[in-house]
Amino acid sequence: MIYNEEARKRLKDGVNKLANAVKVTLGPKGRNVVIEQDYGAPHITKDGVTVAKSVYLEDVYENIGAELVRNVASKTGTDAGDGTTTATVLAQAIVNEGLKNVTAGANPIEIKRGIDKAVSTITEYIKSQAIPVDYDIIENVATISANNDPEIGKLIADAFKKVTTSGVITMESSQSTETYIQVVEGLRFESSYLSPYFVTNTDNNSCILENPIVLVCNRKIDNIKEFLYILQMCAEKNRAILIIANEVDPDLLSTLIINRINNGLKVCVVKSPFYKRQEMLDDIVAVTGGKYCTEEESAIKCIGGCEKATITKDYVTIINGNGDTTEYIKNLDKERAARLGGGVAIIYVGANSEIELAEKRDRIDDAICATKAAIDEGVVAGGGSTYLRAPLPTATGDQAIGVSIVAKALEAPLRQICENGELSADLIIAKVRETKLGYNAKTEKFEDLIKAGILDPAKVTRTALENAASVAGLILTTECVIKKKETPRI
């Protein structure tokens, strides 16, 4: 274990090594990062979280620092869908400036309080500046997040037009070089697999079931006997099965997992949606063409089905269910009818090579996630300008140092955008502060970024700062770092 200044320095070194690899991807003139793979061609990407997840440092203590910032990137991606590189850049700036002051004798606890105070004020400002989105704004946000690719921006805007802003958009690889949209019937609800052993795609930790039977149980299931016939049928016909239940007995779940691992049973068990459970279950039953599986009704009489089901750690998506919802939708309120009637837009991504396909999928995924964040909370001026215009709270003592650390860190995103474009960061930042204009790094012009369509989702801008400040505060107040005991090699 290590203590005091040495502990913080080693953590900082790890933060810097990871952040330096990630931040080269920021902005319209950001660079690619080439990542070695275990098998096949290297992965080329501008996706910050992909880069962050690929960095491993030999020094254990430095790697702990890198892991802390890696978590910032991952959490920002999970919370807001984008902004992973911005969060990393902000975290690095706060850590470096903060540790200078801690080393000089400032109280780290008071510095952290000042940082938290500043972040609270800034996030309220970001919320107040947010503009609701329309389809033109959606296209602009998607274009910027896709590394300023207007074709991808238009593609995603078209997808949302087809299924509305409350609809579902997913992505798959095309069988050709063309990239196109297909709208199918389906729905999505918040839930996840009950065990990671159900995962079939370890690249994105998802479970994909082709042409599965769907069984919906609005109750706890605890007796394997009532499902034996269906499970045997699935095993014999090599058919997948998706089970949705309110609760599952641990022994029953273990039995299904063992059959999944040892016997290749294509099964996944998910918990019923928590939010508006009864409504959502009714919709699932209608879409899949099944019935509720009760203790009185034989399970085989209750099965529905769909063309495909995708289960991630956050959502379950059912595509092209076997049910006919035409009459069912007529009796629903507008919100539910829109959710079911809108369907699912699938973007099939095509490219000329596997390397190009992987890079393009990264950019489209970023664009979809950023667009969803913009729909949630609106948009603000991009290019780092919203951070520079944010007001700061008054503070005294070492808390004032914390506020000033955040003030300086707020320059970091625009500074990095400029450096990636080999532009004079100090001059550009000074002019943005002096005027009401922002800097468009793509055209290298000062202009009204809202009118120019240079927009960032407010949710991304807010979440990136909150997560960066949170982990930076932890590093500043760290006094000891302990590494795991090394297991002796046999």
Question: Which residues make up each language-model segment?
Answer:
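Long, structured protein-protein interaction/assembly regions in large complexes
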Residues: 123-377, 381, 481-490
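A structural-propensity feature for long, helix-poor, extended segments
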Residues: 101-142, 208-211, 216-217, 300-320, ...
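Core structural elements
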Residues: 42, 89-96, 120-123, 127, ...
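Glycine-rich oxoanion-binding loops at beta->alpha junctions
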Residues: 41-77, 194-206, 211, 217-229
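Conserved phosphate/anionic-ligand binding catalytic regions in large, soluble enzymes, centered on
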Residues: 22-32, 74-91, 148-173, 376-390, ...
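Residue-level signature of catalytic and energy-coupling elements of molecular machines
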Residues: 11, 27, 81, 105, ...
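N-terminal, positively charged regions that mediate nucleic acid binding
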Residues: 1-39
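Extended, low-charge hydrophobic alpha-helical regions
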Residues: 3, 9-11, 56-63, 261, ...
